[in-house]
Amino acid sequence: TELSSGGRSTDTTILSMSLIRRLRNDLDLQPKARKLLSFTDNRQDASLQAGHFNDFVEIALLRSALYRAVKANEQTGISHDVLTMKVFQSLDLPVEYYASDPEVRFAQKAETDRALREVLGYRIYRDLKRGWRITSPNLEQSGLLRIEYASLEELCTAEDVWQNTHEVLTSASPETRIRIAKVLLDYMRRE
């Protein structure tokens, strides 16, 4: 990004991430010296920047896990009913990163994993809403993810389904129906 294309919080986050990456790779520095220290003139600005930075990292982790899941299933695609499981598996977080009790086992471990999958599902679909992040387009907006609808083509080519609908749909070609249905479904999903 160019420094003028985002807001101050976005630019500060991107510069901070870049500096942290460079510091981690600088083997001339001792590990405890590889830190970034930032100053601000008030608590409100500090809180805003910390929240922005945390959100940026969370979204980057979520999107990278979604991208890896999609790439791993490129040939078959991923249906919505297993999407969160695939993203959860791609995320591959150690249990201590998301469980209040890192020693959790058995049914409690399964329940803890399920809770994280539900949060991931919510966050995935919320992130896919268009226009929600102005300076950070989602994977679909970036062309890295394509959403398709099960049986849409079969539905739109089945003439008997369209017999008692509006005359415009009855007389439309299957290709036109597919385009119309996809636009409508995309709009409903994004809004």
In which residue ranges do the predicted regions lie?
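Charged, low-complexity interaction segments
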Residues: T1-E191
